Amino acid sequence: MKRLLLASVALLAAGCGHDYARSAAQIPVAPTIAAQPLPQVPNPPAPVAAAPAPQVAAAPAQASSRTDYSVPANWLCKPGTSNNPCEVNIDATIVKADGSTELQKYAGNPNAPIDCFYVYPTVSLDPFTQSDLVPGPEEFNVVKSQLARLGSQCRIFAPMYRQFSLGALRARMSGGAAVPTRGTPADAAADVDDAWAWYLANENKGRGVVILGHSQGSGQITRLIAAKVDGKPDQAKLVSAIVMGSTVQVPKGADVGGTFKSIPVCKTASQTGCVISFSSFRDNVPPSETAGFGLGRGETEAVCTNPAALGG
């Protein structure tokens, strides 16, 4: 079961960094979605391209308010919720190396023996610095494309959180006009912490859990794991940590240390309690020396695990 879960991470490798290498043969590349519309939000803004992981400034110590995760509406995906975007038809067309295709039917497993706790990337189109807790098409679409297929291996928990919005990130990176302030940067971290605490107290019941995120979500789970899991009793529950489009550091030549003090790098598909991390770039455009992710710093190097072949 755990081997299958780690192997299923290969599905994420097709597009969860910040630039896209050529896809390996025989992976799902064209989902075949049945006519099953996602929940609608009035007047959704036009879709925009994904952006790199934000390097968010140091947050104030206090959140502007706390979020109650006993309220089902504050979860994007959670077992038993209505209009769950992680429970849609995600049959896919497999394109093989010889060009032939095969329809891969998908079936979720509500009785999966482990859980997945996911924090999504920078996608919010809200016109303020911090997003609200009302999901829009952008949040629905990212969990459908990145996360939902793991529902065949784990129960999925994905909280809404007051993330640093895409508009705020663009303004910061371009030097353009700032977007209006709402809340504080500490709101995002407080939400992720509170969602994790509620999940542990009410849903975990001693089950193994995969903690995964992408981009801004990876920054949040890295902080969460370092503070709440690494070297703590809950580390025993960790099936794996999957940190995509961000950087986990280890001492050069080592498998443990650096970002996490006692959680090693995953080396085999059957290994548990370990971390998978990667950022993808075009094969002919490696990360520059000024890249915000994918590079080592000083005496450390960036973890770079191939999720489709953990043995190297």
Describe the predicted segments one by one:
Residues 2-7:
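Sec-dependent signal peptide recognition
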Residues 13-15:
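C-terminal motif of bacterial Sec signal peptides marking the signal peptidase cleavage site
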Residues 17-19:
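Bacterial signal peptide processing site
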Residues 21-61:
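Post-signal peptide N-terminal segment of mature Sec-exported envelope proteins
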Residues 57-103:
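N-terminal module-boundary/linker segments of secreted carbohydrate-active enzymes
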Residues 73, 79-82, 109, 118-208:
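Active-site catalytic motif of lipid deacylating hydrolases and related acyltransferases
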Residues 186-205, 226-312:
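Surface cap/lid and interfacial helix-loop subdomains adjacent to catalytic sites
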Residues 213-217, 221:
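Gly/Ala-rich beta-loop-alpha elbow adjacent to hydrolase catalytic centers
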